[in-house]
């Protein structure tokens, strides 16, 4: 009986509460709807991604086309949270995460002139490379680099030396009769001993026979043609001397 009494009392209390709620709220569906909307029951709660969760710590950097007139500057909003501050520092220290388009670079690059090629006719009077700011700050002197001689200059110098030697040979009487002009065939000079022996033979006989020419050539270490030519020239010289004597007389 005690259990029945307690259950009856519970049901009566529940019914009395429902009777009190009924005049305030017209229907149970309305009560459920208001309760759900108040505490967010069936409303859709989409999960936020990592990018939206940390959107307050850093903002996405947008790339702008570089403006040659004025450099663009980017301002980042950072929060003061401890956990967000860790991400802020890590992202701020990462140089790859920043877009440096349009920002003036800290280091200035200077163009370097190419060095002239060896053998070329052109040569710059100044140094082959532009001085750096550090060199200018240290009062470094700019030295001139001498121009290397080209192949054409070397050829001209060689021609000049050859012409000078030819002029010396032409002015020197002792070497003029030994060396002929470069256009003609080079003569074969005879030694003093050879000339003396040929002169003796010429005094005995102006016209040597063939056998005697071979014998003289063998004794003087000459060829038969050389002995023959020498005798021909010697006869022409003797005739010229005779003509000159007749004119003088």
Swiss-Prot record:
Region annotation (Disordered) ranges: 152-183
InterPro entries listed in its UniProt record: Abd-B_homeobox_TF, HD, HD_metazoa, Homeobox_CS, Homeodomain-like_sf, Hox9_activation_N, HXA9/HXB9/HXC9
Oxidoreductase among keywords: no
Gene3D superfamilies: Homeodomain-like
CDD domains: homeodomain (cd00086)
Subcellular location, record wording: Nucleus
A Gene Ontology molecular function term of the record: RNA polymerase II cis-regulatory region sequence-specific DNA binding
One Pfam family cited in the UniProt record for this chain: Hox9_act
Comp. bias intervals (Basic and acidic residues): 154-170
DNA-binding region (UniProt annotation): 183-242
A GO CC annotation given for this chain: nucleus
GO biological process: anterior/posterior pattern specification; DNA-templated transcription; embryonic skeletal system morphogenesis; proximal/distal pattern formation
Signal peptide segment: none
Superkingdom of source: Eukaryota
SUPFAM superfamilies: Homeodomain-like
Keywords associated with the record: Developmental protein, DNA-binding, Homeobox, Nucleus, Transcription, Transcription regulation
Entry annotated with the keyword Repressor: no
Annotated family: Belongs to the Abd-B homeobox family.
Cited function: Sequence-specific transcription factor which is part of a developmental regulatory system that provides cells with specific positional identities on the anterior-posterior axis.
Designated name of the protein: Homeobox protein Hox-A9b
Lineage of the species this protein comes from: Eukaryota, Metazoa, Chordata, Craniata, Vertebrata
């Amino acid at each position: 009986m005690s259990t029945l009494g307690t259950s009856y009392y519970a049901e009566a209390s529940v019914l009395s509460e429902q009777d009190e709620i009924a005049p305030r709220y017209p229907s149970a569906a309305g009560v459920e709807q208001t309760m759900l909307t108040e505490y967010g029951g069936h409303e859709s709660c989409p999960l936020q991604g990592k990018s939206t969760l940390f959107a307050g710590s850093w903002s996405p950097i947008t790339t702008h086309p570089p403006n040659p007139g004025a450099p663009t500057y980017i301002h980042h909003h950072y929060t003061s949270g401890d956990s967000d501050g860790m991400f802020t520092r890590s992202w701020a220290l990462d140089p790859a995460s920043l877009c440096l388009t349009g920002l003036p670079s800290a280091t200035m690059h200077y163009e370097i002139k190419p060095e002239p090629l060896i053998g070329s006719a052109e040569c710059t009077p100044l140094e082959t490379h532009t001085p750096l700011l550090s060199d200018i700050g240290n009062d470094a002197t700019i030295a001139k680099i001498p121009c290397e001689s080209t192949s054409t200059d070397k050829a001209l110098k060689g021609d000049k030396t050859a012409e000078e030697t030819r002029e010396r040979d032409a002015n020197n009487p002792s070497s003029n009769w030994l060396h002929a002009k470069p256009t003609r065939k080079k003569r074969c000079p005879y030694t003093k001993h050879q000339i003396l022996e040929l002169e003796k033979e010429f005094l005995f006989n102006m016209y040597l026979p063939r056998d005697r020419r071979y014998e003289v050539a063998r004794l003087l270490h000459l060829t038969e043609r050389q002995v023959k030519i020498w005798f021909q020239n010697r006869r022409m010289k003797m005739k010229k001397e005779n003509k000159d004597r007749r004119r003088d007389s």
